[in-house]
């Protein structure tokens, strides 16, 4: 390998927040003239952006580092697992350097030591003003803040990413505008805690296009809603002021979609998680949201088998599912994470019980999901095309986020292109997906 070639291999793991970090590093690499290598053997060095949220993610990251070391030998590690350098070096002592998440300057300095900066080339350095994106051209993640002020007992992300730091609202809206001008049809708003946006700045007033705008979720949504694209909210903590964005959904300014992790419904379990413990209030709010915005899609995630969870607690959760009738739900079996305070809680749940509860949970939610999707047969809706395959077009409705939700299949519609917006009539459904035809 030539040390003057300026080629960098890149492996990106983890959540959409990590994807955005990877995009920023890749953008800086391309801006400085580095080539991004598609293979290990052609790269001067390999960057691995890791995840460290749960044990399986840690193992995946360690495996990826090991593969890069075997195939190339020169590896720089960054990302959430990088905050635990001792864990990485215990398994892979030969990595060149380790840094934590969003350590962009440190990562670039490490790259410079291994692969010298290429000579400036105005053609190589023509990077789009949106930067390098790892998503398809028609949608993009818009990260509005870093870190989190909550200390949920099952989560160690604040130890990686620190407390909440909100981006200036003018910077966020400027990035959104550039993305839209370059053809993005859907903005996926992400952070560790989207509804806390601006709390750390005391909702400081920023400026956008000469107008004062508060650094706050409602005002952000209001401005994004003027850009003429789909706007989807992710990772929304159930603060009371979440209610303020529902009218924007009802008015069509942003998508009627709320990704709001409730985690459980039992007051005792929620207390042990250090989460809001008012299931009855949550059900009341869900009812109000649906009154204001009948088309709203509610996505949530839950944990079963948390330490101390009794059969009665679990039944409370199942009852909540039946009453809430959520559209999209993810469920995880509790897994101890090194450094999480939940590890100190008494009465751990046996693995066989966790599995049994997870299966019961999924059986209930699968039935709910199937029922809610069956109700869409015969209705018309707008979908966005994600890809076109031999059988037809694979799309998503306003109720479906990329990768985590369902899809809408349009058989034989091979003339469509990714990013096309199409009005369809739904003809069939199963537990998670829909089938339709253009109208």
UniProtKB/Swiss-Prot annotation:
Gene3D superfamilies: Methylthiotransferase, N-terminal domain, Nucleic acid-binding proteins, tm_1862 like domain. Signal peptide: none annotated. One of its GO terms (biological process) is tRNA modification. Its main location: cytoplasm. [4Fe-4S] cluster 1 binds at residues 15, 51, 80. Residues 374-439 form the TRAM domain. It is found in: Cytoplasm. Its EC number is 2.8.4.4. Its cofactor is [4Fe-4S] cluster. [4Fe-4S] cluster 2 binds at residues 148, 152, 155. It is an enzyme of class 2 (transferase). It catalyses: L-aspartate(89)-[ribosomal protein uS12]-hydrogen + (sulfur carrier)-SH + AH2 + 2 S-adenosyl-L-methionine = 3-methylsulfanyl-L-aspartate(89)-[ribosomal protein uS12]-hydrogen + (sulfur carrier)-H + 5'-deoxyadenosine + L-methionine + A + S-adenosyl-L-homocysteine + 2 H(+). InterPro entries: Elp3/MiaA/NifB-like_rSAM, Methylthiotransferase, Methylthiotransferase_CS, Methylthiotransferase_N, Methylthiotransferase_N_sf, NA-bd_OB-fold, Ribosomal_uS12_MeSTrfase_RimO, rSAM. GO terms for cellular component: cytosol. CDD domains: Radical_SAM. Residues 6-116 form the MTTase N-terminal domain. Keywords: 4Fe-4S, Cytoplasm, Iron, Iron-sulfur, Metal-binding, S-adenosyl-L-methionine, Transferase. GO terms for molecular function: 4 iron, 4 sulfur cluster binding; aspartic acid methylthiotransferase activity; metal ion binding; protein methylthiotransferase activity. Belongs to the methylthiotransferase family. RimO subfamily. Catalyzes the methylthiolation of an aspartic acid residue of ribosomal protein uS12. This is Ribosomal protein uS12 methylthiotransferase RimO. It comes from Hahella chejuensis (strain KCTC 2396). The lineage of its organism: Bacteria, Pseudomonadati, Pseudomonadota, Gammaproteobacteria, Oceanospirillales.
């Amino acid at each position: 390998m030539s040390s003057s070639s300026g080629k960098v291999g890149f492996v990106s793991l983890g959540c959409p927040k990590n994807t955005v970090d990877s995009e920023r590093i890749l953008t800086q690499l391309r801006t400085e003239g580095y080539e991004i290598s598609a293979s290990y053997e052609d790269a001067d060095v390999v960057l691995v952006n890791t995840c460290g949220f749960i044990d399986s993610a840690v193992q995946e990251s360690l495996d990826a580092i090991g593969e890069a070391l075997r195939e190339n030998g020169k590896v720089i590690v960054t990302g959430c697992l990088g905050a635990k350098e001792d864990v990485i070096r215990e398994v892979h002592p030969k990595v060149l350097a380790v840094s934590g998440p969003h350590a962009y300057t440190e990562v670039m300095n490490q790259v410079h030591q291994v692969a010298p900066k290429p000579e400036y080339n105005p053609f190589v350095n023509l990077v789009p003003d949106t930067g390098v994106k790892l998503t398809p051209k028609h949608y993009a993640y818009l990260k509005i803040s870093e870190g989190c002020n909550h200390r949920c007992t099952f989560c160690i992300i604040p130890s990686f990413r620190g407390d909440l730091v909100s981006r200036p609202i003018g910077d966020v809206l400027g990035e959104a505008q550039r993305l839209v001008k370059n053809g993005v049809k859907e903005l996926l708003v992400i952070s560790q805690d989207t509804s806390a946006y601006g709390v750390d700045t005391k909702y400081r007033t920023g400026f956008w296009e000469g107008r004062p705008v508060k650094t706050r979720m409602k005002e952000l949504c209001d401005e994004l809603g003027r850009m003429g694209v789909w706007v989807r909210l992710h990772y929304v903590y159930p603060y009371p002021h979440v209610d303020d964005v529902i009218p924007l959904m009802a008015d069509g300014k942003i998508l009627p979609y709320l990704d709001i992790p409730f985690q459980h419904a039992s007051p005792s379990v929620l207390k042990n998680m250090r989460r809001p413990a008012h299931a009855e209030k949550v059900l009341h709010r869900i009812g109000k949201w649906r009154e204001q915005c009948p088309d709203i899609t509610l996505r949530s995630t839950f944990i079963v088998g948390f330490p101390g969870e009794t059969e009665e607690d679990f039944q409370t959760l199942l009852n909540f599912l039946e009453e809430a009738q959520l559209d999209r739900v993810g469920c995880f079996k509790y897994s101890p994470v090194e450094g999480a305070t939940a590890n100190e809680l008494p009465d751990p749940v046996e693995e066989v019980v966790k599995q049994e509860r997870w299966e019961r949970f999924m059986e209930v939610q699968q039935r709910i999901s199937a029922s809610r999707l069956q109700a869409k047969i015969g209705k018309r809706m707008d979908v966005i095309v994600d890809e076109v395959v031999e059988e037809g077009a694979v799309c998503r409705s306003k109720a479906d986020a990329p990768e985590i939700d369902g899809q809408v299949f349009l058989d034989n519609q091979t003339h469509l292109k990714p990013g096309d917006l199409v009005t369809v009539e739904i003809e069939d459904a199963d537990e998670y997906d829909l089938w339709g035809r253009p109208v």
